Amino acid sequence: MPQSWRVQHGRVTLKTLEQLSQEDWRRFFSYFRDREIADWNGAKPTRYPFWLFKKLMLDDFNALERFSFGMYDELEQFMGSVELYDLHPYPPATPKIATLGIVIGERERWGKGYGREAVRAALEFAFSRLPSALERVRLTTFLHNKRAQAAFKAAGFRQVGLHERTDHTDVLMEISRLEWVEEQEQGSG
């Protein structure tokens, strides 16, 4: 069983999945069934029943195949999730690289800085809270998702490439632990 973590940055608190209430789980599930949110994440809305969605998420979390968090605002209201997944090398080896994913399911929170703060909290976890800190965190976002790119850049990510697909272009971004540490020392994180 993984350790319970709680990481805060600014107005955002991240809590590991076993800390989510049943109501939080229901909201979480609703985000994955929402067409617009799925589109922004390059996915299709989940068709799983609630019980299976929750089981799959907890199974991955408990197997340490990903680090998953519920995202809460300053009033402790659930508003989304952050994950570090696609761990390399794959556990049980000690991972050094992960991919970051974020979903803000509450539309009234979009464009208000919560994403940037959640990403900064996830980077603090990845680079300073894990017993064996990651060396690099990467992500992919759509070229047309300028709001996400701005949030990721504000959290310290840099663009490292573009990936042309048949129907869209992905922006590849990453940050190393060394870059993150330098930002913390300069006081910009």
What are these regions (language model features)?
Residues 1-22, 33-34, 68, 75-189:
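Acyl-donor (CoA/ACP) binding surface of acyl/acetyltransferases
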Residues 26-27, 39, 182:
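Short, solvent-exposed alpha-helical surface patches in well-structured domains
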Residues 30-34, 43, 59, 154:
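Residues within well-ordered alpha-helical secondary structure of globular protein domains
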Residues 36-56:
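Conserved GNAT-fold acetyl-CoA-binding loop/helix
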Residues 50-51, 61-64, 171-173:
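Short, intrinsically disordered/low-complexity patches at protein termini
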